[in-house]
Amino acid sequence: MSFATADLCDAHEDQLALGTLRVLEPVFHLFSRAGCFSGEAVTLKVFEDNALVRATLEEKGAGRVLVVDGGGSQRCALVGGNLAQIAQQNGWAGIVLNGCVRDTLELNEVNVGIAALATCPRRGQKLGTGERGVAVQLPGALVRPGEWIYADSDGVLVASAALK
């Protein structure tokens, strides 16, 4: 599906006013060759630990978007080239990460959309801590499981339901 978040905002101003369509703060950068991505949100809340991220991406994605609240930490990466490959193999549409990525040259080779705050070469821990299926607070909006994510180079949108 090809779209522009700017056009979606223009077409759904009523939902913006109601709060059923929200815009994340402009702190996310795209780190893959996918120009835009969208899908139903699967949420995780972790901190400097990517074991739950890996476990989730190893499941069938079915065109969904993994939304990870990494607490905004920029001390380590939660997603890198290996996890991006796993996400692509399992049919995930994208990843929105309130945290860092690494292996950016490898990320540029995958067709999974990846939006994150920044890069960091250090890997995250693998302790298995965190929560799945909870509402997560990202910069600018709360994201609930089952809501819809739309992302491109202009920004990231969160919609209560799929946009037509």
UniProtKB/Swiss-Prot annotation:
<dbReference type="GO" id="GO:0047443">
    <property type="term" value="F:4-hydroxy-4-methyl-2-oxoglutarate aldolase activity"/>
</dbReference>
<feature type="binding site">
    <location>
        <position position="102"/>
    </location>
    <ligand>
        <name>substrate</name>
    </ligand>
</feature>
<feature type="binding site">
    <location>
        <begin position="80"/>
        <end position="83"/>
    </location>
    <ligand>
        <name>substrate</name>
    </ligand>
</feature>
<dbReference type="GO" id="GO:0008428">
    <property type="term" value="F:ribonuclease inhibitor activity"/>
</dbReference>
<comment type="subunit">
    <text>Homotrimer.</text>
</comment>
<dbReference type="GO" id="GO:0008948">
    <property type="term" value="F:oxaloacetate decarboxylase activity"/>
</dbReference>
<keyword id="KW-0479">Metal-binding</keyword>
<dbReference type="InterPro" id="IPR005493">
    <property type="entry name" value="RraA/RraA-like"/>
</dbReference>
<comment type="function">
    <text>Catalyzes the aldol cleavage of 4-hydroxy-4-methyl-2-oxoglutarate (HMG) into 2 molecules of pyruvate. Also contains a secondary oxaloacetate (OAA) decarboxylase activity due to the common pyruvate enolate transition state formed following C-C bond cleavage in the retro-aldol and decarboxylation reactions.</text>
</comment>
<protein>
    <recommendedName>
        <fullName>Putative 4-hydroxy-4-methyl-2-oxoglutarate aldolase</fullName>
        <ecNumber>4.1.3.17</ecNumber>
        <ecNumber>4.1.1.112</ecNumber>
    </recommendedName>
</protein>
<feature type="binding site">
    <location>
        <position position="103"/>
    </location>
    <ligand>
        <name>a divalent metal cation</name>
    </ligand>
</feature>
<keyword id="KW-0456">Lyase</keyword>
<dbReference type="InterPro" id="IPR010203">
    <property type="entry name" value="RraA"/>
</dbReference>
<dbReference type="GO" id="GO:0051252">
    <property type="term" value="P:regulation of RNA metabolic process"/>
</dbReference>
<dbReference type="GO" id="GO:0046872">
    <property type="term" value="F:metal ion binding"/>
</dbReference>
<comment type="similarity">
    <text>Belongs to the class II aldolase/RraA-like family.</text>
</comment>
<dbReference type="Pfam" id="PF03737">
    <property type="entry name" value="RraA-like"/>
</dbReference>
<dbReference type="InterPro" id="IPR036704">
    <property type="entry name" value="RraA/RraA-like_sf"/>
</dbReference>
